[in-house]
Amino acid sequence: MVRFTLNGQSVSSNSPVDTPLLWVLREELKLTGTKFGCGIAQCGACTIHLDGSAARACVMPLTAVENRSETTIEGLATPAGAALVSAWEAEQVPQCGYCQSGQIMQAATLLEKNAQPSESDIVSHMDGHLCRCMAYPRIKKAIFAASRAMSGEMLGE
C-alpha cells in the first residue's frame, strides 16, 4: 500500500507500485482532470504538482509519490490557480480543452515562483506543453492576465 497526500487529503492506493500515477488518479481515485496525452512525458497533458513542483504523472510510478504531497487540477486552490482559471475564461483560451488542465498546472508553478513573469519567462516555463489547437498566443495572454489579476489589476484591461 502506498500512502500520500492528494489535494490536501491523506489517501492510499493498493495498485501495483509501478503503476503510473496518472492511472491511479484517473481509474482508482476517479480524478479525471489530469489527462493522458502521449504517455512519454512529452506533451504536458498529465501535469500535476508534486511537492509544489510541476511533474508529469504519465511516467511517474506510484511508488515515487509515497509520503509526498501532490495536487491535481481538481485541488488547485491557490491564488495563482484561481487567477489562471479566471484568466483562461476571460481570454477564451480553451478550444478542445484537452491540454488545459496541464497548461494551468504548469502556469501555476510559474506564477507561484514569479508573479510578474516576462514573455521569455512564460515561453521558457511553458516549453514542452503541447496544444493541438495552437492556442499558444491566448495561453500566453491568459498568463499575463492572471499575473496582473494577482497584483490587483482587473482582467481584460
What are these regions (language model features)?
Residues 1-157:
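Signature of N-terminal electron-transfer/Fe-S-associated modules in redox systems
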